């Protein structure tokens, strides 16, 4: 016999029974619906199955050597059993934990359910109270109206006759229903109507469920039903109506932050009002604006008050309040190194003096032997004192650099050459030091020269109110020689003494703040700023904002070129990690987040842009026309400036602004820091300008573009060479000066009329010489009546080039014939002389 004997064959069918019913809808539509009845298969375990499974999973069975899998030792079996026991314990713990969590969740759900029920119960009671109150008021009002109406009718109408009530009774009897007879059972039609009414009620009740039942599908009823959502909406509307009957929702009063200018749409959003309503309110005030236009703060405040809100004035400058302005406590202040700025006239030996102190040679690396950058160095003296030195340029073009050096310094060392005395930049340095209110030490340099006269220096300083100690003043003065090292120790001692008197202290634990001494765009490192830390400690990773730029400190490099992790007060460092090149003189502040730094930088950039737009905008049409007319009369020399550092670029721009007069001027189209790029060439080509590179070069693409577009690129490393060349180029735009030289006079003796030529004057040259190419003026009674040129000059019948004094000749004027005997002809020549800018 086969194993399959007595068993039915397997198949996919028979799992469920199906049939079709037809569902009817309104308007004669039908739909066939498939109805399935699924059968469930119940599996009953065989007797003894549970016992065998228990036996199989028992440890004794696993530990039985006879039934143990082959190749498993006792130790391995013990480990497996321990793992099983640990797993069972974990399962028990997990089950307990899940049960506890479920219990807590159930308690939380129960608590929330009770709170919700209590809230709903309070709302129902409140709604019921409001509804009852409204009904009582309405009933009282109706009763009062009915009583008043009856009293009014009683006053107007006479008492009715008793017989008048008879027809009313008859009418009431006639209007009574006649279908039902008292005491008789209902008829068949009445029973059918009652059944229809019950069926309709049941049908309406089932429509709330929103589901199609099998009975409805078979009976064809309940085709188009009302949705459950519609019923919920109606119930919610009725509930809200009952709760808010006779009460208007209270308007929420908001505090609206109001900047200096705001767009109408944004104002509406902050008030949570419709923009159309705000526009309508502004139109009532006489302002025809759209929702995308801006309005001023005063107008917006009136609108806010009209809508019942409160205006809170805020300024765009509030974003800068996040900058830390902590007042340092006395116990947190620690001594810091003094900052000494070396200032003086060009070539008076400032950098050489600093080289002698540092025992280095910086001046040999400067172009032209003059300092064109501001340098910051730290020097440790033999006594162990640390001094921070700032070396400033002495050239006249670097006024702003010297001013920046004086603003951040503690002590100014004024270097004056003993053989040159006080010069213009020396006077300027004195003014900067006095404006910054910092003490001054005079270093009389080049004392080793034979023609040195230190007393002349001291006497010249008296004219500028600088009185040294040797002349009974309070300003220290030291005679030094940077070449031989004479007097350097005394100078350092005086600096240390002055620093002790100042008692310089700072808090190194606060957020860092410093001043940008110099900034540049390095090819390999990007924007780099030389920062002198004034307060706090600047660390790697700090987020900072400086002027219109922001960044994160990627690296700190000290004056020796070494990378450091932090820089304390009075320490100069190069900061890497800026998103752009800042302006020299900007203040660096450390902030908490990158978002704050970006927001402050964006605000400062917008403020600077608005300031430039306001400065360049003409207020009236007359001013605009006058400016255009003035510009038309002035010749311009456009240039594009690129420099290695920000301070040099500023100095070049300031120097070029002074070049020119009322006829010609230099126009700087753009100045920046870094190499000359293709963008600079495109700008210069569009404006017919020259590109000037100061200690920078053009990249390959820029050089190629310059050759293609015929744009001139000039390179310089010394600023006064640059200024001299630009001055020469601007001088070429000046109109040449015309000078007249009188070469002779002739008197008209007689006038002849010649056919084809016109009037010809027979003249006698009384003085000088008469030339054919010269200009002439006709004088009558010493009054000039004509100025022009000669058409012909003849002696006898020959055309000649010139006629000497005392000889007679014939002259005819070009396009002029009103000549008379006795008139005087003045003969002159014009010469054009090139002009130069002073």
Swiss-Prot record:
Biased composition (Low complexity): 50-60, 162-177
GO molecular function term, any single one: GTPase activity
Annotated stretches, region: G5: 481-483
Keyword list, A-Z: Cytoplasm, GTP-binding, Initiation factor, Nucleotide-binding, Protein biosynthesis
Residues reported in the UniProt entry to bind GTP: 344-351, 391-395, 445-448
Annotated region (Disordered), positions in chain: 1-235
Claim: Ion transport is one of the keywords in the record: no
Disulfide bonds: none
Cell compartments where the protein resides: Cytoplasm
G2: annotated segments: 369-373
GO cellular component entries: cytosol
Coiled-coil positions: none
Sequence segments annotated as region (G1): 344-351
One Pfam family in the UniProt entry: GTP_EFTU
Main location, first listed in the record: cytoplasm
Summary of the function given for this chain in its UniProt record: One of the essential components for the initiation of protein synthesis. Protects formylmethionyl-tRNA from spontaneous hydrolysis and promotes its binding to the 30S ribosomal subunits. Also involved in the hydrolysis of GTP during the formation of the 70S ribosomal complex.
Family recorded in the similarity comment: Belongs to the TRAFAC class translation factor GTPase superfamily. Classic translation factor GTPase family. IF-2 subfamily.
Protein name: Translation initiation factor IF-2
Natural source organism: Cereibacter sphaeroides (strain ATCC 17025 / ATH 2.4.3) (Rhodobacter sphaeroides)
Gene: infB
